[in-house]
């Protein structure tokens, strides 16, 4: 290489380039590696310890993720490699220019200019430790350098207008904070003799709490800014370099619920709190100030917190809310008057319809009730004897029903005497069975077009009041029914009752009625939401339509939402009934569906069957025999098989044999000659049907019903200790054939109440069988039936039953049997 090589790299001319070959004998290389190492050790610049406040970049409004932050590590390299490393990071557009002079913006100066430029590049004041200074908040727990215009957290003090706050440092709150702030200084910083290397490692360890000079959250949010004494301008902290920013300090340790500050109470356990209220406020809001770093966030997110089922949490919250006591009602009742307490005898005089009164009533009330019943029985016997000799009077059963109604009215008047019921009385709404309502199978043998039983036998729906004595706050409504009992209803049929509600307040009430079940068996037929005027009353119609054989129990709620008033009424009913029908080859039905006629050659022996094949429940039957004068045969003159009272199982029948003494038959023929003809003059279209057909020698009265209702009557008699007579009939004094042993009411069954007596009276039925010894009289009675039916060519019978709410019209119009000639 004789000629000098042209080298215009830095616009300079080198004097000489040694390009002679290397001598093989020279052991040392041209490149001295040890010299380079020594050069690096001499010229290395240590990174300042407190590099978190360094940086020449302003903060960004968004917080980048920790994993996405790129850290640039600066190292001092040899001058020969510095230019190449710098040029490697330059853009491609800049590197496309081969002239280094255009990049460094100087044309002359030589090697000294390059060194000066390099020193400026690597100067401490121009060094960027991190590409994004925001990462210092996540890496070392320190807040990023910010100014008041680019800070994402709200400023506590206005830097220009707000005067310095007057903080009472002697307050127990701030005094406690300052005391705890001093406690946060680690012990390693308090010992001056500690190793410096250990201190540096603690500074770089994120798990070790930072000191007060490095923590951005160590001071209270209330006194984090220092102010100048002369002006209100905030004074920046002095432990920073010029050109670096530091925003207001704040505490985040108590914001997050899962923060370790809520679990670690070791710092404040040794302090004595002034009051319990201050301790509660301190534990929830004034938590210890501590720097939040990455490891703390990781422990919170990946701690021992277990996932909880949402439904389980909601159920637990519902149970806690249900366990809370109800809100007290602080309304002042200015119209409430104190009613004096009545004597015990007067308060318990109405125990016939009271379900919650004491079972052991006083002797006075029992004596009065017994006397009243004896008087009624005497009146019944006298009326029966008078009816036997008077052809224009009503039948015996009608008289007994009238007597029972009178006895009920007397009992009702005694209950209402003295201000009505007490607050412990209970009235049960039951289906009615009075003169205006009839049964399809002839309870008392009367027919009617009425189709709905709406009132109880004791008129508890419309006349029995719930009482005038109230405990506590006055109630806006007076509900006369405390319980609704439907009894036994046939499957597929419907029975309706009415529940009366009266507004006793001085303003309108929006009343809502509902049931606690969605079953269609019980339905409220009227509007479920009704406005009731003051001092007015309404009636809710409730229907019971059983779909299968069984017992149905629901709760009906009547409430006034605006006044937080609610009244619950239990309702129960049985699906399925017994259906008794007499069967015999010689038996024929008369015009009345509950009356039959039968011809027998011997009056001393009467035999027939009672069938319950169409019934779905067990039933009972009780038999009584009367002569043509409507006198009941004495027990010594008649015998029954299997017994006067017996049980017929469902889907079965039972044969009945009756034996009459011959001596009574002869006596009856002599004494009954004149009365039999007079009884035949009674009108067949009268509302009170005769119980014996003209020419009949005897008639049998069969009373029947569901055995489950008679069992409740027996339990009521055991509970009250009083004998129960229903319309003069005794259903409990003797043992019925095939009846079961009386047991206590099982748990969950409707409770035995005094109203079960009225429910039984409204549910039992009966039919009559007329016995003829002469075929001529028997044919006359049956032909009279056909003649009465054919007397009106357009006669329609309306069949009704107490167990229906619809009227079934059976077209039994008889068309005369006439022959029409064929016209050609």
UniProtKB/Swiss-Prot annotation:
Specify the superkingdom: Eukaryota
Result when mutating residue 573 to S: In or183; induces centrosome defects leading to defects in bipolar spindle assembly
A GO term for molecular function = molecular adaptor activity
Q: Does the keyword Ribosomal protein apply?
A: no
Query: Which GO CC terms are listed, alphabetically?
Result: centriole; centrosome; cytoplasm; pericentriolar material
Q: Which InterPro entries does the annotation name? A: Cep192_Spd-2-like_dom, Ig-like_fold
Q: Cite the effect that the entry attributes to residue 615 to E.
A: In or188; results in centrosome duplication defects resulting in failure to assemble the bipolar spindle
Extent of Polar residues compositional bias: 59-70, 207-225
Q: Which UniProt keywords apply?
A: Cell cycle, Coiled coil, Cytoplasm, Cytoskeleton, Developmental protein
Annotated region (Disordered) at 16-98, 189-252, 342-372, 433-455
User: Where is the protein situated, by its record's location annotation?
Assistant: Cytoplasm, Cytoskeleton, Microtubule organizing center, Centrosome, Centriole; Cytoplasm, Cytoskeleton, Microtubule organizing center, Centrosome
Effect on the protein of changing residue 710 to Q: In oj29; induces centrosome defects leading to defects in bipolar spindle assembly
What's this chain's function?
Required both for centrosome duplication and maturation. Required for pericentriolar material (PCM) recruitment.
Subunit structure of this entry? Interacts with sas-7 (via C-terminus); may be recruited to centrioles by sas-7.
- Quote the protein name from its UniProt record: Spindle-defective protein 2
Q: What is the lineage of its organism?
A: Eukaryota, Metazoa, Ecdysozoa, Nematoda, Chromadorea
């Amino acid at each position: 290489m004789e000629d000098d090589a042209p080298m215009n790299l830095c616009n300079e001319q080198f004097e000489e380039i040694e390009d002679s070959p290397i001598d093989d004998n020279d052991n040392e290389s041209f490149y001295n590696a040890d010299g380079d190492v020594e050069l690096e050790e001499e010229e290395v610049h240590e990174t300042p310890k407190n590099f978190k406040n360094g940086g020449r970049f302003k903060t960004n409004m968004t917080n980048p993720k920790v994993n996405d932050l790129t850290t640039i590590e600066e190292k001092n390299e040899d001058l020969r490699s510095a230019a190449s490393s710098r040029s490697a990071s330059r853009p491609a557009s800049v590197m496309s220019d081969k002239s280094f002079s255009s990049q460094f913006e100087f044309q002359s100066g030589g090697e000294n200019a390059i060194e000066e430029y390099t020193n400026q590049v690597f100067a401490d004041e121009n060094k960027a430790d991190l590409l994004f200074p925001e990462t210092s908040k996540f890496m070392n727990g320190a807040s990023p350098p910010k100014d008041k215009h680019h800070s994402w957290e709200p400023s506590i003090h206005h830097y220009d207008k707000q005067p310095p706050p007057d903080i009472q440092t002697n307050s127990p709150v701030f005094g406690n904070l300052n005391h705890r702030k001093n406690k946060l200084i680690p012990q390693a910083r308090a010992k001056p003799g500690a190793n410096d290397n250990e201190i540096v490692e603690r500074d770089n360890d994120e798990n070790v709490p930072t000191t007060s000079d490095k923590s951005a959250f160590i001071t209270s949010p209330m006194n984090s800014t220092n102010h100048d004494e002369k002006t209100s301008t905030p004074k920046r902290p002095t432990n920073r370099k010029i050109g670096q920013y530091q925003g207001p300090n704040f505490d985040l340790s108590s914001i997050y619920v899962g923060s370790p500050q809520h679990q670690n109470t070791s710092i404040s356990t040794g302090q004595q709190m002034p009051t319990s209220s201050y301790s509660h406020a301190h534990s929830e809001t004034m938590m210890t100030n501590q720097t939040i770093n990455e490891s703390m966030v990781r422990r919170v997110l990946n701690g021992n917190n277990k996932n909880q089922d949402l439904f389980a949490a909601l159920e637990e919250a519902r149970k806690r809310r249900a366990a809370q006591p109800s809100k007290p009602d602080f309304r002042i009742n200015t119209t409430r008057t104190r009613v004096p307490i009545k004597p015990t005898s007067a308060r318990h005089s109405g125990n016939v319809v009271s379900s919650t009164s004491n079972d052991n009533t006083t002797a006075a009330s029992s004596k009065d009730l017994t006397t009243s019943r004896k008087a009624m029985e005497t009146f019944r016997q006298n009326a029966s004897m008078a009816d036997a000799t008077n052809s224009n009077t009503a039948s015996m059963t009608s008289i007994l029903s009238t007597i029972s109604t009178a006895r009920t009215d007397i009992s009702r008047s005694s209950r209402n005497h003295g201000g009505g019921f007490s607050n412990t009385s209970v009235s049960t709404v039951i289906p009615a069975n009075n003169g205006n309502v009839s049964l399809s199978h002839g309870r008392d043998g009367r027919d009617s077009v009425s189709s709905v039983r709406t009132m109880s036998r004791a008129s508890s729906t419309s006349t029995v009041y719930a009482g005038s004595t109230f405990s506590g706050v006055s109630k806006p409504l007076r509900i006369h029914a405390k319980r609704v009992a439907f009894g036994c209803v046939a499957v597929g049929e419907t029975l309706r009752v009415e529940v009366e509600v009266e507004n006793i307040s001085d303003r309108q009430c929006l009343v809502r009625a509902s049931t606690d079940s969605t079953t269609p068996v019980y339905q409220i037929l009227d509007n479920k939401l009704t406005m009731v005027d003051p001092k007015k009353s309404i009636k809710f119609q409730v229907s019971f339509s059983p779909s299968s054989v069984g017992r149905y129990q629901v709760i009906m709620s009547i409430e006034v939402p605006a006044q937080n008033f609610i009244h619950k009424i239990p309702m129960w009913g049985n699906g399925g009934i017994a259906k008794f029908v007499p069967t015999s080859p010689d038996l024929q039905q008369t015009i009345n569906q509950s009356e039959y006629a039968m011809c027998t050659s011997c009056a001393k022996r009467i035999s027939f069957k009672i069938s319950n094949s169409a019934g779905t429940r067990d039933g009972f039957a009780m038999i009584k025999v009367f002569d043509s004068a409507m006198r009941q045969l004495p027990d010594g003159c008649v015998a029954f098989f299997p017994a006067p009272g017996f049980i017929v199982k469902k889907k079965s029948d039972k044969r009945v044999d009756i034996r009459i003494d011959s001596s009574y038959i002869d006596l009856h023929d002599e004494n009954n000659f004149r009365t039999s003809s007079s009884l035949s003059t009674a009108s067949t279209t009268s509302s009170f049907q005769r119980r014996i057909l003209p020419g009949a020698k005897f008639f049998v009265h069969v009373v029947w019903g569901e055995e489950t209702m008679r069992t409740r009557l027996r339990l009521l008699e055991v509970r009250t200790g009083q004998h129960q007579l229903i319309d003069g009939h005794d259903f409990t004094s003797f043992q019925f054939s095939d009846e079961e042993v009386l047991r206590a009411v099982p748990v969950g069954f409707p409770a035995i109440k005094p109203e079960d007596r009225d429910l039984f009276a409204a549910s039992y039925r009966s039919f009559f069988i007329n016995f003829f010894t002469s075929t001529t009289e028997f044919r006359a009675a049956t032909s009279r039936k056909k003649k009465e039916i054919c007397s009106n060519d357009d006669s329609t019978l309306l069949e009704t039953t107490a167990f229906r709410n619809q009227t079934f019209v059976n077209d039994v119009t008889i068309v005369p049997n006439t022959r029409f000639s064929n016209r050609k």
